């Protein structure tokens, strides 16, 4: 009989987007409980060791973290398996580097460097709005923040911009047609485009149609849509490729062109 939470994670059962090879060990780091789900997060150890190559082993990552060099969303994190997720800002004081976790078009977390100015805020999707004890309204975001007394105009699926120093909402974007969004789940994960229309299906999932910058259209569930800007101006910088997914033939041509120019 299972007693309590699972403490291990086998390498073959780890999320594919962590990109761990299955032959270098049996186990993968199991993320701690935190603001992001196991299959939608990137543990700090994988980011520092496998992505940035700042350490060779887990022990080295631990030594880096225990010196309190790593901040996530402005807070020092010493847990090597802390689950960092979509839109989180990772800052390394010692090197003066800042990263934002956003998806590339293949659905993996890109190592996306940002400026110190951009590292002061993050965008959060509003998951639900409730009225708590004594009639205090509050909203819950995709990264498990609870913010009391929000602007009554803000509704579910809107995006709020949060100042990481104070934790307060500075502005917000309505979920509306014509706004630019990023897909954060499903087969189109990581694609960026403008919302063209929303099909309402009472009792089921609403479907949202999106058109990307190169004119390709696709549809996904409303729960997979994260609005990132007003009109076609995103409020955050995007990783290389700007969220436009290429076809296999286009990728091949791009590779060949790069090979010829370097050769």
UniProtKB/Swiss-Prot annotation:
Gene3D superfamilies: 2.30.30.30, 2.40.50.740, RNA-binding S4 domain. SMART domains: S4. Keywords: Ribonucleoprotein, Ribosomal protein, RNA-binding, rRNA-binding. One of its GO terms (molecular function) is rRNA binding. Residues 42-104 form the S4 RNA-binding domain. It comes from the Eukaryota. GO terms for biological process: translation. GO terms for cellular component: cytosolic small ribosomal subunit. HAMAP family: Ribosomal_eS4. Belongs to the eukaryotic ribosomal protein eS4 family. This is Small ribosomal subunit protein eS4, Y isoform 1.
